[in-house]
Amino acid sequence: MGNEFSGVVEEVGNNVDEFSVGDRVYCRMPLDKIGAFAEFAAVNKNALAKIPDYLSFEQAACVPLTALTAYQSFDLMKVKENERIFISGGTGSLGAMAIPIAKNFGLKVITNGSAKNKERVIDLGVDEFIDYRTQDYSEILSDIDYVLDTLGEKELEKEFKILKNDGILVSLKGMPNKEFAERMGLSSIKKVLFGVVGRKFDKIAQKKNQKYYFLFVNENGAQLSQVSKIFEQNKIQPSIDEIFELSEVNKALKKVDNGESKGKTLLKIN
């Protein structure tokens, strides 16, 4: 178990020149080798990146999964400078990463959430904030270039509504579709299966020549290195909720499962 980690390089392979013993590194674990809840992990160099100097190990451990999710979403969209993106529910931990990364891509960022979080996301760079308790974004916004969906199926139709003709929606919690299966190189049977489960949203997108993508984040050291540069330039401060010892792993997992975390919940392995 464990999707991401920060730590120190203890050994390197014979053909590794990019990293040295003692380097501070972080990583989104490869999908076939999830296992960050451990004292040591053997990881392909192509999944690793060096930690920005200003981040502690604890802060760095918060970064890879959510930051890569945001980065890969914008990469999939092929975003262009000065265009508008709506990030649904952008006041959470993903938004805290996605907003400054979106600004680094030159995007104009709109998000919604609770009014108590308005100032915090404005400080992150949001250009327009919508209080979901008093305003319905689907009645306010239109002709949006991109939507990053973090809420899932119950919001997707409203998100398509605000998207311009030929706009692009990337969902992190919707249904995978055939395009996702093809992009991920999945089996023929999964292409058929995902083609069925994602058909509803493909059809909605086709009405206005829009594009619907489902994203499941992959390990990518080169992209994570770009994230490191963005963090270094902007001095982004990851949000930590609580740090547990490895012996408290069940307590930590329960907290996350119950949705009680207001930032990242970490395990510290001594």
Language model: regions and residue ranges:
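Glycine-rich beta-strand-centered segment in the early N-terminal region that forms part
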Residues: M1-I34
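NAD(P)H dinucleotide-binding glycine-rich loop of Rossmann-like/cofactor-binding domains
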Residues: R28-G89
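Mid-domain Rossmann-like dinucleotide-binding core that forms the NAD(H)/NADP(H) cofactor-binding site
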Residues: P64-T134
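A short acidic, Gly/Pro-enriched loop at the edge of an enzyme's catalytic core
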Residues: E139-Y146
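Glycine-rich phosphate-binding loop and adjacent beta-alpha segment
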Residues: K154-Q233, I269
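C-terminal hydrophobic helical "lid"/dimerization subdomain
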Residues: V217-N270
